[in-house]
Amino acid sequence: DTGSVFGCGLAAFNCKLRIYYLEAGLRSGNLQHPYPEEGYRQMIARIADVNFTPTELSAQNLINEKVHGKIHIVGNSVLDNLIEFGKPTMLNKILITLHRREDHHWMDSWFNEIEKLALEYPHYEFIIPIHPNPNVQKHRHILKNVTVLEPLEHKDLIKILMESNLIISDSGGLQEEGSFFNKKVIVCRKTTERPEGISTGHL
């Protein structure tokens, strides 16, 4: 999605159209993690006329970078839409999502560790909606004691998240959504562009 945003932003810049960038200012501080999203985010913010940030920290990131566009803190529209789902529960489920390209070369190691956990804690249902990328799919045979699902619509994924006791993920969005529903999220990445979740104890 950041690639699509960057492509549209660059086209608008070339056509001298105004650019309004939603979810601006997320930063990990490492161009390789997440890759290529971190680079796209920095480049879009540089050419945007208006940057809409979700938090004070993300706004401060843009101030530190001395971007030329205006900066407005507007909150997170994704989380606004989660209110309609109601209150979460806490069942013996653990939701897993792993897909990031910087994780592809050790995806088999991640899956082996998940399989070990599923064997060690059989009273939990480990659930993974597996990503369609071939670099992920080729390792699905490792997951013999894990409930492997085909990719889910967002609303169905959120329903499982709301019932889960724990989330294990390399997703940026699930860090936000898990924190919103007061779930603990184990982040399978070297860094995160959402440090607010660390300060609240969810990540």
Language model region names:
Residues D1-I128, N133-L203:
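Nucleotide-activated sugar donor-binding and catalytic core shared by glycosyltransferases
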